[in-house]
Amino acid sequence: MICAFLRVVQHAEKLHGSLGRQLLPHFVFTKACFKTQPLRWGLREQKITVQPRTVLRFTQKTFWTQGPDPRKAKEDSTKQVSIRRNQREETGVSMSQKVREAGRDVSYLIVVLFGVGLTGGLLYAIFKELFFSSSPNIIYGKALGKCRTHPEVIGVFGEPLKGYGEMSRRGRRQHVRFSEYVNNGLKRIRVKFYIEGSEPGKQGTVHAEVEENPGSGQFEFRYIFVEVTPTRSIIVEDNRSEQS
C-alpha cells in the first residue's frame, strides 16, 4: 500500500512538472506582453507626438530652403545688369546700323539722281541735235538739201551729191564744224562742211549761216554759198539784205 501511494505521489509530481513546463512559457510570454504593453503605447504616443515635430521641422526646412539666397540674388542681379548692358549694346549697334543704312541709302539716292540727271541731259542733247532748228546737224542737213536741188551746184559737181565734215589725220570724217555768236541780241550759227559729186577731183566747201527769228524763235538761213575754187563761189541762198 505504501509502495502504491508513493508511486501515485511520484506520478502526480511528474504530471505537475509537465504541466508547469507547458504553462510556464505561456505565462511568461503573457506577463511580458502585459508588462511591455504600456511601453508599446508609450512608443505609439511618442511617435504621435514626434510626428508633428517632424512635420514642423520639415516645413521649417522647406520654408528655409525656399527663402532668398544671397548668392542667387547676386547672380540674378548680375544677370539683370548683363541683360541691360546687352540691351544697351544692341540698341547702340542698331542705331549705328540704322545710321550706316541711312547713309548708304542717301548715297544710292544721290547716285540714282545723278544717273537720271545725266541720262536726261543726254536725251535732251540728242533731241536738240535731231529736232531743234538751232542744231548744227539740222542746219547741215537743210543746207545740203538746198545744194542738192541747186542746178549750178549739180552742174559743177555732178550727181549724186554727198556731204561730210572735217577730215581727221587718219582720214576719218568728223562732225560738221560750227560756231555761235550774238549780233544785236540775236543768236547766229555758222556751219562749214564739204561736198563731192560724180565729177572726179571736184570738191566744194559749203558755208552757211542762220539767224534766230525773234517772232517765231526759229532759225532761218542768212546765206548759203559753195566755194568751188578760191576765186569762184556759187550762191545758193542769200537773205542778208532782207534780215539787215
Swiss-Prot record:
Membrane spanning residue stretches: 107-127
UniProt feature, compositional bias: Basic and acidic residues: 69-78
Compartments, as annotated in UniProt: Mitochondrion membrane
Membrane protein topology class: Single-pass membrane protein
This protein's GO CC annotations: mitochondrion; TIM23 mitochondrial import inner membrane translocase complex
Biological function: Participates in the translocation of transit peptide-containing proteins across the mitochondrial inner membrane. Also required for assembly of mitochondrial respiratory chain complex I and complex IV as component of the MITRAC (mitochondrial translation regulation assembly intermediate of cytochrome c oxidase complex) complex. Probably shuttles between the presequence translocase and respiratory-chain assembly intermediates in a process that promotes incorporation of early nuclear-encoded subunits into these complexes.
Subunit relationships: Component of the TIM23 complex. Component of the MITRAC (mitochondrial translation regulation assembly intermediate of cytochrome c oxidase complex) complex, the core components of this complex being COA3/MITRAC12 and COX14. Interacts with COA3 and MT-CO1/COX1.
UniProt name for this protein: Mitochondrial import inner membrane translocase subunit Tim21
Species: Mus musculus
Name of the encoding gene: Timm21
